[in-house]
Structures are given as C-alpha cells and as structure tokens.
C-alpha cells in the first residue's frame, strides 16, 4: 500500500464532523429533510444498498466532493463492496469526469481502503 500525506477516509469525516454539527444546530430542518431524503434514496429496492453506494461514490468523484467520497467509500465498505468493484466504479467516474477523476479516483480508493476490513 502506498503512503500518502492526505486523509481521504476517516480523517475527512472527522475533520468535517464539528462543522457539520454546528451547522445542523443552526438549520435543523434542512438536516432533518436531508436525512429523510438520504434514507429514502439509499433504502433497499430494485437496486441493493451496495450498488447505490457505488453509484454515489462515482458521483462523489465526478463532483469532486471529498466528504462525499469518504462517506460513500465507507458505505461501500459497510455494504461489502470489493476493491475490484470500487476500482471499476472509479473507472466509470474517470470516464465521465475526465482528468479530475484521475485525481479524485485515487482518493476514493484510499478512502475505501481506510474503511474496508
């Protein structure tokens, strides 16, 4: 495994947590609404939770959101995605986002490895 100087998994989520709690206290209704949307969108359905987390990970890479990458890398790991599945997901994200995907894709892989058993 390659050494890297930036946190991409747990470190990102830990860094964002205090600010997130602070903002949630200021606009609780928005956060409650988002939580309901998230629960509905990620509920088991025709697509299983693992597939939904992999989709979200690809989108997170494409929109260059480090917090989203960390969150959905964790979700992919929790839902038992394999490293090979994550790598293919990253490949699709690179195809859809171009050069930035080659920057954020490795971050996503590092984040997944941080959460994977």
Give the positions of each predicted feature.
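Amphipathic alpha-helical segments within well-ordered protein domains
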Residues: 38-39, 56, 73-77, 91
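Acidic, glycine/proline-rich low-complexity segments that act as flexible tails and inter-domain linkers
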Residues: 1-51, 104-117
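Immediate flanking context of iron-sulfur cluster ligation sites
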Residues: 46-63, 84-91
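Short cysteine clusters
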Residues: 65-68
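Iron-sulfur (Fe-S) cluster-binding segments and ferredoxin-like electron-carrier domains
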Residues: 71-83, 112
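C-terminal structural segments of small proteins and small subunits
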Residues: 87-112
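Intrinsically disordered, low-complexity cationic segments
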Residues: 3-7, 71, 89
